Regions:
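Accessory "access/gating" subregions that flank catalytic or transport cores
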Residues: 198-330, 438-446
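Alpha-helical support elements that line or immediately flank enzyme active sites
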Residues: 18-35, 286-298, 343-351
Length: 446
């Protein structure tokens, strides 16, 4: 399967790529699959299973399904209008399928969250049914992480032929040696199979623009995050504090943490974010990119493009041979993957060799092994927001540590990813985005 950098970095809304973006896309896909049968539909029923059913209310999965059935997309929905759109459906008991065909919709009956039932293929399963006089269509979808959705027959694979295909770190390094180019160049050449260079660069700078706007929004807003935990936003106050204390020798790392907090507070509030590679870990790559732009002499837009291409290459390997889904392998697959991608991107723009870049990514994966996904209240707030700040700081340190070496190291990226996958398989389900273990049961919700 060919994976583009734009598959890994997609514009969406918070708070979760697997639990918000994925269900919204699945619901819209179901409506599109109705085709000419759409006018015959009298009722639609959606059932969410596994992690989606267990933590879906906290992650906004219910709202996402309503929006997707209404024809909205994560990329284009007006985040400011979402509460009103959802409230209108709930208060009227009516839903306009695909924005074209109005039906009755009783949420208590027609949107079922199964907290302790799972489908066999993946923890994040969904079944949609449409009825006229009889059943018109039934489809099963799985939200497999990062906003990716696959159907019951598997992923609809992109069969694009790439000039330099790779699925492992070893293959990627071999390509770099054969071609005598950095990792970003290998990824760029593959991207040219889909679109011209100018479009690739413009698209990545558009991604960067959304990231920077997300940070700005996070720095401007304060108050309490939605959901009932009464978690207060901290980014705005911390920003003011850092501006008033410019002489602190450790301020660079404080800024990194600040940028991550800003993004993840926006994500927790349902704002516009970029999956990087997931929403739960969306603050790490923007934070490290902001570090590059603010603190690295000679930083440029061209460097941002190289950073994102390099991070994307590592993301391809992680998605193909590991996992970026907290419901599959715990938070090691989300924050761990984002840390690895950010560390690799930073190492390249700081002048690292392909071997040093791969080393930076490996450090990012290795030192998140075993990390659980145990969101308190099923919300992407505790421990998720702070965890992004720590993950971003670790990414900077991983890049710097790799650059102080020559690229040779005992544990390869491929071995670290294999270990992540195996650790995730051994991890109890209660530690994989179900809110039934860890902090989620030891912290009392207020």
């Amino acid at each position: 399967m060919a994976i583009s950098v734009f598959d890994l970095f997609s514009i969406g809304i918070g708070p979760s790529s697997s639990h918000t973006v994925g269900p919204m896309r699945a619901a819209r896909l179901f409506v599109e699959a109705l085709g000419d049968d759409l006018p015959r539909v009298r009722r639609v029923k959606a059932e969410l299973f596994g992690s989606l059913g267990a933590t879906g209310f906290g992650h906004g999965s219910d709202r996402a399904v309503l929006l997707g059935l209404s024809g909205e997309t994560p990329e284009d929905v007006d985040t400011g209008a979402v509460p009103a759109l959802v409230d209108a459906i709930r208060s009227s008991g009516r839903l306009c399928l695909g924005g074209r065909h109005e039906i009755r919709f009783d949420e208590d009956r027609d949107l079922v969250m199964h907290r302790r039932r799972s489908l066999p293929e993946h923890p994040n399963g969904m079944i949609f049914r449409a009825y006229g006089e009889d059943l018109l269509l039934e489809r099963t979808y799985y939200s497999v992480g990062g906003g990716f959705v696959r159907g019951e027959r598997g992923v609809v694979e992109d069969s694009t032929s790439l000039p330099h295909p790779f699925t492992t770190g070893g293959e990627l390094l071999a390509l770099c040696r054969e071609e005598g180019v950095p990792i970003s160049e290998i990824m760029l050449r593959n991207e040219l199979a889909w679109r011209p260079r100018a479009e690739v660069e413009a698209g990545l700078l558009r991604i960067w623009d959304v990231m920077t706007q997300c940070v700005r929004n996070g720095l401007e807003h304060d108050g309490v995050l939605p959901g009932g935990l009464k978690v207060r936003r901290r980014a705005k106050a911390l920003h003011a504090k850092l501006l008033s204390e410019p002489g602190d020798s450790l301020s660079a790392m404080d800024w990194v943490g600040l940028y991550a907090l800003a993004v993840n507070e926006e994500n927790a509030s349902g704002g516009r974010v970029v999956t990087a590679p997931t929403n739960g870990a969306a603050g790490i790559i923007p934070a490290v990119l902001h570090y590059y732009r603010r603190f690295v002499e000679g930083a440029s837009d061209a460097g941002v493009v190289r950073f994102l291409l390099t991070a994307g290459a590592i993301g391809v390997i992680l998605k193909t041979t590991g996992s970026i889904s907290g419901a599959e392998v715990g938070c090691q697959g989300e924050v761990g993957s984002a840390c690895a991608m950010a560390a690799a991107g930073l190492a390249e723009v700081l002048g690292g060799s392909p071997e040093q870049v791969e080393n930076a990514a490996e450090i990012g994966v290795e030192h998140h092994l075993g990390l659980t996904c145990d969101p308190v209240g099923g919300l992407v707030q505790i421990p998720c927001i702070e965890r992004n700040a720590i993950g971003a700081s670790k990414a900077v340190q991983a890049a710097r540590m790799a650059l102080h070496g020559d690229g040779s190291h005992v544990v390869t990226l491929d071995k670290a990813i294999k270990t992540m996958r195996e650790t995730g398989a051994d991890m109890k389900v209660k530690y994989k985005e179900t809110a039934r273990g860890g902090l989620a049961v030891n912290v009392i919700e207020c």
